[in-house]
Amino acid sequence: SSTETPPSYNQLNYNENLLRFFNSKPVTAPVELDPPKVESSYVSSARGEDARSTLSPVQGFEGSGGSGSSGNFTTGSNLHMSSVTNTSNAGTGTSGTGNSGDGGGGGGANGTGSGAAPPVTLTESLLNKHNDEMEKFMLKKHRESRGRSGEKNKKSANEAMKMLEYSGPGPGHGHGIKRGGSHSWEGEANKPKQQLTLNTSGGGGGVGVGGGMPLFLDITHASSSSQNKGLAGVGVGGAGGVVGGGGSGTGLGGNGNVGSGNGNNNQPSTNQYTQSRLPCTQNINLWPPFSVGITTPTSVLSSHTAVPPSSFSPQHSLFPTFYYIPASIAASSPSSTNTNPNRPHKHAHVHNSSEKPSTSQAAAATMPLQYMTGVMYPHPSLFYTHPAAAAATAMV
């Protein structure tokens, strides 16, 4: 039978029926005995059996079956054998009553007092009832046996899953570690940016614009109000601001207050970038072009201080402004700024006419050198295109 449908009672019972039949050692009668005597012997033997024991009627029938082995009786016994199991120990093996003509005395096979038992007629309903009970019992056994095998399979499956779980965490945790490392690396890459923005609020703040504002807001505010806070180095992305040098160290870029920031801007303009950078770079100068005392960088820096909001606003979209000093602002600043009011205010020594080409050239010359170590930039093309844009804006 298929595993889906439970086997029938006869299928489950087949081997047990065969064993029970041959263990009973049936005694076959000579063929001379006629069927009526066989039937009488069956009745007498069944009368001697105890009806209350589950199998006694049937086993009495099978045990005395040897007494008359005429054709119809043996077929009947075989039919019952195929449908009835032997679970009680009514001694059918000894119940062969031999060849007695009337079959009397067959009840001795049952261990109980055969004579005292009330006569029981073996009916079809009794056999059906017995078969139903035994079928339930056999199906229960079958389910239990299948359940054991199913449990074994489940255990093996669970063990396999456990093995996978134990082996899984190796690569799984490896991925997790990689992810964690990447996140921490990204976090470290972003940390300078965050620190810069916080410091830039101080940077512009030291200049008097006040902390808490973004870098570009501080710078534009400072440059528009007195343009002395451009000293924070608008070109430097608020160099005083980037490092917070202006904000924290008022003695540096944004010396003192908003109005006085420009006073030192000439000489600290070069130092301002270096000194204001110191908090971020741990006293390591990462922007050599501005630390060198060359006239063109100073002029570039002086022009940075005078950048108005209009020239700086286009740079808001360039996220690297927090990372490096955008020299393009320096180039574009002279053309768009009111140099006359700013220059006497900032640097009287700067030449307005000659500064435009010098600033663009200086921007082009210094742009490739403005990378900060330890900072990721999107692509070099962004920076190499700035000088051209700066020159174009300067020519306007």
Curated annotation (Swiss-Prot):
Record key words, sorted: Biological rhythms, Cytoplasm, Nucleus, Phosphoprotein, Repeat
Statement: the UniProt record of this protein carries the keyword Nucleus: yes
Record field: compositional bias (Low complexity): 333-342
Chain residue ranges for the region called Disordered: 27-120, 164-188, 253-273, 333-362
Record note on modification: Phosphorylated with a circadian rhythmicity, probably by the double-time protein (dbt). Phosphorylation could be implicated in the stability of per monomer and in the formation of heterodimer per-tim.
Subcellular location: Nucleus; Cytoplasm, Perinuclear region
GO function term, MF aspect, one: transcription cis-regulatory region binding
Cellular component GO terms held in the UniProt record: nucleus; perinuclear region of cytoplasm
Keyword Cytoplasm: yes
GO terms classed as biological process: circadian regulation of gene expression; entrainment of circadian clock by photoperiod; negative regulation of transcription by RNA polymerase II
Composition-biased stretches (Gly residues): 93-114, 253-262
Subunit structure: Forms a heterodimer with timeless (TIM); the complex then translocates into the nucleus.
General function of this protein: Essential for biological clock functions. Determines the period length of circadian and ultradian rhythms; an increase in PER dosage leads to shortened circadian rhythms and a decrease leads to lengthened circadian rhythms. Essential for the circadian rhythmicity of locomotor activity, eclosion behavior, and for the rhythmic component of the male courtship song that originates in the thoracic nervous system. The biological cycle depends on the rhythmic formation and nuclear localization of the TIM-PER complex. Light induces the degradation of TIM, which promotes elimination of PER.
This protein's name: Period circadian protein
Species the sequence originates in: Drosophila pavlovskiana (Fruit fly)
